[in-house]
Amino acid sequence: MSITRKGLLGLASGGLLAAAVGTTARPAVAATARAPERIGPARRTLIRNADVITLDAQLGELHGTDVLMEGGKIVAIGKALAVDGAEVVDATGMILMPGMVDGHRHIWQSVHSGAIPKISPVINDYINWKMRVDVCYTPEDAYLAQYAGGLLSIDSGVTSVLDFCHTFHSAEAVEQAVKGLRDAGLPGTFAWQLSRHPVFGPGGSATMAQIMTNSGQAPDEDHWRIAEHVRSLFSGDDDLLRFGLASPIYQDAPISRTAETFARIRRLQPHVLAVHYHRSDKPFSDQSLQNVRQMGEAGLLGPDFHIAHGHGMHDVELQMMRDNDSMICATTMGEHSYPFPSVHGRAARAGVKVGIGIDTGVAFTHDYFQHVRGSYYNLFRTDEGKQIALSMSAEDVLNMASGRAAAAIREARAGTISVGKRADVLLLRTDRLDFPVMRALAERVANFSSYSDLDSVWVAGVARKRDGRMVGVDMAALKQKVNAMTERLHAQADTIRLT
């Protein structure tokens, strides 16, 4: 049986799918490339003479400006800074901007790029594909998928992610998933989704009735034990990668079930409580969960609460999200074909913390600049969205993928080029023949930049990409490992029969 992407709206609600700093002289240090699994402390680095998109409302755009990074943070911004003992990067003619933020990505799916492309009839097979591949993963596969997916994010200029990990059903696999993402050095929040053990495996079969019955129930106790184990893998909010959990949302089920699940999750104190949420227009009772308004009235929202998608939310629901300091991520490229328009424009206008994300690498490009532009074009689906779009500046559009987006995953440490912020920065080349030399910097980047322009990436002050290549990573060898793994996983998935 084939389930469409639209069918995910129901299944995803269940458990299964579910001021400058003083600069004292120091001896010069030779640059050293480190492998990701040995990512060392940030080096003192001076980016010299860059044109800077700060996305800091107090600073704006700066031309011919120096930025000093030390101890993983931005410690000075100014003209012709006098600095000794730092690696100097000549950024003349280049654009420096904050690292980008993805507020909803299934990192593990990044290695399956092209398995279910959006522009293809097979997009309707997404759920069938996901359910079958999901159960074939080993702990070793979980590590490789998360490690490679984390590197792909950094390679594309994404330096913070909310990883909605809706797979892996053993403590060993989830632990390796965390280790892979941590070894990749990608900051953000790892939010593993509580669910239930699948009712089938490689070589097995199941009916959709069995799957639906299983997915509509509360997480099993083994998954709660795994969640407690995952919590033990994180030391606290000072980590680059922080602990989160993702919950099923039981639309059409008693709201008390969601309340009980949320309460138990919050006892584990996740940095983010993430949910997939798709609006339902069915008639509802006070006991049957249908919308965010009910969750708000039940006291389930809060500053840890994060919604992925949320398309079609009503104004009163957006007001509740704002008043509870809750967060939203719109995956605008994928949502363009959804029955209701993406919510990011209206959410931003309402004062909600909102950003954008890719969602899944199986269907969409990792060139995040395309998603930035897609978030703008998506607004033109409706007359209301068009008016919002026409009121936005290029800085507003970039902010939806950086400063505003960072706030929308509770990542206050990043998102702008400001003194004291974490040194997550991107350096873009501008020497491409068709890269414009006129208009504001943000307008040039928002309209014209692409993955090919990305020269360098620093994460917490550590150079992860230089001269267009990842530092200390043999990407060709990694690709061979990934291809071998995905070929095996897909072959195993083909042995599963869903009817």
Predicted region positions:
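Active-site gating loops and adjacent loop-to-helix segments of metal-dependent hydrolytic enzymes
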Residues: S113-A142, H197-Q217, D281-G302, N324-M327, ...
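Metal-coordinating catalytic core of metallo-dependent amide/deamination hydrolases
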Residues: P36-E37, E172-V316
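His/Asp/Glu-enriched, well-ordered alpha-helical/loop segment
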Residues: A298-L300, D304, G345-R432
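A conserved active-site cap/scaffold subdomain adjacent to cofactor or substrate pockets
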Residues: C329-T331, E335-P339, V343, A350-V352, ...
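Active-site microenvironment of metallo-dependent hydrolases
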Residues: S2-T65, E70-K73, A80, N399-T499
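Alpha-helical scaffold segments that flank or form the walls of functional sites
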Residues: G114-C165, H169-P187, D222-D237, K481-M485
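Glycine-enriched alpha-helix->loop->beta-strand junction motifs that scaffold or abut catalytic
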Residues: R267-P270, L300-P303, M320-C329, R349-V354
